[in-house]
């Protein structure tokens, strides 16, 4: 009973932002993140696209508020005889220099048995001493991942196979005056605010659909599935620091955005002000209740 009461209580959005910032949701591999959202939101369900969706109210008009979950990342593209992994970048929109952020960094490989820590190798400074520097910038094609395996069998024993998702290791960092730094911190903080707002909102007349959508970076499949399955909508609110225009809005209606101020966007230290997450949850709660 106590555990049930905890689930029914609205979570504190700032600590939840830190928690979500420590999770990984590579485009096309958001299932674990969706599982967590479903646990946090009693009554929410997984739709055919893989979104976590909570429907409030009934009838017209219908409105949608959506927060994207996905992030740029990689999959295991090859497993060498010596146990090293090679990578392919997952398709979709990515920030500039995304591959260069990978070189020499800790990564997490998500295998059948869960998270496997690993590292992306760098050139040996001893073996390359006296040679000219690399002319071309580092790319995913030059990445070799070491997870401590000595051969293919040890890779398999770790639960890692081809197409296993790979992303930078998540180590959310709090610094300064209530600042949170982590990859895609803006999206994670926005989704935390929406989870909190969804818990105790009183929806306006009609239907309000709250969706945590997948594959936004690739084809907006999650958002478009929500539009086709639950729309048409008169209004849509996107909780996302990405300001890319929605050109095929169709039945999304009037599209607006809510976002936190983000510094160093698209980098491993993307930074958001944690003290602004609770006010964002308040604005989202007001929107769900029929406010502008």
Give the positions of each predicted feature:
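N-terminal hydrophobic/helix-forming segments and targeting peptides
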Residues: 2-292
């Amino acid at each position: 009973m106590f555990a049930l009461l905890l689930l029914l209580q609205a979570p504190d959005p700032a600590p939840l932002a830190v928690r979500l910032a420590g999770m990984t949701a590579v485009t096309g591999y958001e299932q674990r993140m969706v599982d967590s959202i479903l646990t946090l939101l009693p009554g929410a369900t997984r739709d055919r696209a893989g979104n976590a969706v909570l429907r409030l109210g009934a009838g017209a008009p219908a409105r949608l508020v959506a927060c994207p979950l996905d992030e740029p990342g990689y999959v295991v593209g090859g497993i060498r005889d010596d146990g090293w992994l090679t990578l392919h970048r997952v398709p979709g929109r990515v920030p500039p220099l995304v591959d260069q952020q990978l070189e020499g960094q800790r990564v997490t490989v998500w295998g059948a048995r869960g998270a496997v820590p690993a590292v992306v190798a760098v050139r040996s400074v001893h073996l390359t001493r006296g040679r000219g520097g690399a002319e071309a910038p580092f790319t995913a094609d030059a990445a070799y991942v070491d997870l401590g395996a000595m051969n293919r069998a040890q890779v398999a024993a770790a639960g890692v196979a081809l197409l296993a998702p790979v992303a930078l290791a998540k180590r959310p960092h709090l610094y300064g005056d209530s600042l949170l730094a982590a990859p895609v911190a803006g999206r994670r903080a926005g989704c935390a605010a929406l989870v909190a707002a969804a818990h105790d909102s009183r929806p306006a007349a009609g239907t309000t659909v709250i969706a945590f959508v997948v594959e936004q970076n690739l084809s907006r499949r999650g958002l478009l599935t929500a539009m086709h399955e639950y729309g048409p909508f008169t209004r849509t609110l996107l909780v996302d620091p990405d300001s890319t225009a929605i050109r095929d809005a169709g039945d999304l209606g009037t599209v607006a955005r809510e976002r936190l101020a983000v510094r160093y966007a698209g980098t491993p230290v993307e930074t958001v002000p944690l003290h602004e997450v609770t006010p964002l949850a308040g604005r989202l709660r007001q929107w769900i209740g029929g406010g502008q």
